[in-house]
Amino acid sequence: MELRVGNKYRLGRKIGSGSFGDIYLGTTINTGEEVAIKLECIRTKHPQLHIESKFYKTMQGGIGIPRIIWCGSEGDYNVMVMELLGPSLEDLFNFCSRRFSLKTVLLLADQMISRIDYIHSRDFIHRDIKPDNFLMGLGKKGNLVYIIDFGLAKKFRDARSLKHIPYRENKNLTGTARYASINTHLGIEQSRRDDLESLGYVLMYFNLGALPWQGLKAANKRQKYERISEKKLSTSIVVLCKGFPSEFVNYLNFCRQMHFDQRPDYCHLRKLFRNLFHRLGFTYDYVFDWNLLKFGGPRNPQAIQQAQDGADGQAGHDAVAAAAAVAAAAAASSHQQQQHKVNAALGGGGGSAAQQQLQGGQTLAMLGGNGGGNGSQLIGGNGLNMDDSMAATNSSRPPYDTPERRPSIRMRQGGGGGGGGVGVGGMPSGGGGGGVGNAK
């Protein structure tokens, strides 16, 4: 029996779960366009979907904000239909054997800071910054980072008067304990600084593969929160970031030193990482680790031709030229030369073995099976399928905030499971939603 929503959308299989409600793959009946459909039972004690849809509508028009297509109710459910997105950063992290190269971390950091900046500019804080809540786009927006799941978002100031919410203490932990700021653990009301501190932990999670306060044993959730808090408080920023460029220490120090109602200097934080990116000699070619894992090594003629076929006008020719330049540079430079630059930024340290392995365009291969994490079938069978080209841009600066054609990943039908966003296919987004006081 065919299930329909609003007589406009055909309801398909479940592809994930958000902090509140389940997410399904849907199809627009008239056009065949695939969408994400979030459902929430109308009998739930604390309905959130209507509130979340208002947040999304407030954010509409921002780069990396999912487009809301339709909101309403159908039978026993509140419904929100939104733009379909690709895999979450948590899914991609698992796909890349739970370690990102420094280049990929810096490419992501720039976009993620921009997304948080935009949300704050609209007078809201997210309060659940984690890899599951950042998704990659699809098609032409395949390398654009999106931020999702506003189920825990909160207005931190009045839009007209700009009056900030008051400082409070004895607040319950809201968000995910693994990435929560120190002040959140201490029961202090969250503000803009806390979103950015959480992002700092996400970036170090990508660098390290795991944070020092993961995997702690406890009898119950409350004790686990306490153990995470104790470990986080006792781990200095210098120790946490040991073996990685000092910019990560500077970033976290900056976040922790901010006052409760202080406006963060987002430009300064982006510049920290952009300067490091340039110093290491990386190129803004939008080639992330997951691109290399699938396609391997330098550009080949077929990939360059795909870029040419998929791009428009002069931008297309520029992309092709840049892709060719990346191929030539990758062929000419050795892994040792690239690693030398990374080592210099690390002050002589070599970083982790897995990190070194991914520098200089060296590739890894995963041939089928389950990549682990959140029950996502990552590759093999009906798993990950990248069917668009990776068109590089010939630029020394990151033009992330223009929604131009980027390298892309299109997800085809695959194993479901997991939760957290509006991803689809073999890489559904996320790992069990946001939740209040998630102990992950």
Curated annotation (Swiss-Prot):
It is found in: Nucleus; Cytoplasm, Cytosol. GO terms for biological process: behavioral response to cocaine; cell communication; cellular response to light stimulus; circadian rhythm; endocytosis; imaginal disc growth; locomotor rhythm; negative regulation of apoptotic process. One of its GO terms (molecular function) is ATP binding. Forms a complex with per. Interacts with Dlish. Interacts (via nuclear localization signal) with Bdbt. It catalyses: L-seryl-[protein] + ATP = O-phospho-L-seryl-[protein] + ADP + H(+); L-threonyl-[protein] + ATP = O-phospho-L-threonyl-[protein] + ADP + H(+). The keyword Nucleotide-binding applies. This is Discs overgrown protein kinase. The active site is at D128. Residues 221-224 are annotated as: Nuclear localization signal. It comes from the Eukaryota. Residues 413-440 have a biased composition (Gly residues). The keyword DNA repair does not apply. ATP binds at I15, G16, S17, G18, S19, F20, G21, D22, I23, K38. Keywords: ATP-binding, Biological rhythms, Cytoplasm, Kinase, Nucleotide-binding, Nucleus, Phosphoprotein, Serine/threonine-protein kinase, Transferase.
